[in-house]
Amino acid sequence: MSRTAEVRRDTKETQIRVWVDLDGTGASEVSTGVGFFDHMLDSFARHGGFDLKVETKGDLHIDMHHTVEDTGIVLGQAIKESLDGFKGIRRFGHAYIPMDETLSRCAIDLSNRPYLIWKTDFRTPKVGDMDTELFKEFHHAFAMNAGACVHLECLYGTNSHHIAESGFKALARALRQAVELDPKTHGHAPSTKGVL
């Protein structure tokens, strides 16, 4: 069973193509025009064990908001599409990720009931050229479109680069657990409702 998806989204603000293979090796080709964001998506693929291709062309002459948020939308849609109705997966995942002085944790439920709890504060308004407020926008867009309930929290940390990166890695590792095939589900959705 191939767990891949390709999603395209074209608006007046952004043109985006995302391809994902949930059963890949962590290989990635990412180009969004935002260097630090590319780094985060590469890290997401590597630590999630997903093969990922992201091509985003956005209205960066205005700012990075549309580029980052819309990439989250399309990545979430691609993950959801590749899961084929959430059948046969473990559904839940969690991870603690340390990065030097920072510790982040993420818990995820692939329930098709999207929600985001975000408890992450940054000490600086930017990491490189990227506004730190955009990290919440990305994670919200991702959760809503992946059908994922995501709780992401930085327990402590002072370096904004480390806070952002440990959060992306925590999401990746939690998602890696949640999308794993579970033989005990016998290919069904892991829910008493029988469907997610």
Swiss-Prot record:
Protein name, as recorded: Imidazoleglycerol-phosphate dehydratase
Family: Belongs to the imidazoleglycerol-phosphate dehydratase family.
PROSITE patterns per UniProt: IGP_DEHYDRATASE_1 (PS00954), IGP_DEHYDRATASE_2 (PS00955)
Keyword Lyase: yes
Gene Ontology CC annotation, any one: cytoplasm
CDD domains listed in its UniProt record: IGPD
NCBIfam families: PRK00951.1-5, PRK00951.2-1, PRK00951.2-4
Keywords: Amino-acid biosynthesis, Cytoplasm, Histidine biosynthesis, Lyase
Recorded GO MF terms: imidazoleglycerol-phosphate dehydratase activity
Keyword Mitochondrion: no
Domain of life of the organism encoding this protein: Bacteria
GO BP term (any one): L-histidine biosynthetic process
Enzyme class, UniProt record, top EC level: lyase
Pfam families: IGPD
Record InterPro entries: IGPD_sf, ImidazoleglycerolP_deHydtase, ImidazoleglycerP_deHydtase_CS, Ribosomal_Su5_D2-typ_SF
Localization per record: Cytoplasm
Gene: hisB
